[in-house]
Amino acid sequence: IGLVRKQNEDRFFISDNICAVTDGMGGYRGGEIASTYAVDEIKEYLQSTPTINETSLVDAILHANTRIVNRVAREERLSGMGTTAVVVAKVDDNLLWASVGDSRLYIYRNDELTQITTDHSMVQQLLDAGEITKEEMIVHPQRNLLTRAVGVEEDLHVDSGTLPVKSGDRILLCTDGLSGYISDERIREVLHHIDDNTEVLNTLIADVYDAGAGDNVTIIVGTI
């Protein structure tokens, strides 16, 4: 939960070949409700889907979006709530993913850490425009402003992709409680020096606390 927040607005689920992370936002417990709704709806949708492919991951997030938008329409006090979502599934030799918001998917391969998802955030737009550097994203005053989130509008575009993977690849999903405080280079360094994924988690969470732990943090690490 971190050192500052009183509520944990992060949620996740892990099954045999699918995992997801959500990070909610909004007042009156809205963030907690949105992230819980999203992860539950995504999990239920995918568990009832006979074939998992890139389209079904996108559809799962869109399904969650509709459910949250409808909930907000019924309860005005929840207006403004929403959540990030990143969903990953391993199918054969491919990693399928879908994403909205600034929760991230990384892959670590051959001692290189690559961010697969693109943040839907104000600071990402500034980075793309060449106005700030990757390092400046972490300390920018607008780093928490999202340009896209699940549950905010009926029309939602979900990023998605398919990535070939091989034995030994490591994947990392996280909320901005990690990526908003710890640099990509530090994450790469930890993965380089530590083979045990549980120890990786413990080390990164310790780093977050050393950096102030101003947000909830959720991290999933796995090896193909």
Model-predicted segments: where are they?
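PP2C/PPM-type serine/threonine phosphatase catalytic domain
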Residues: I1-I224
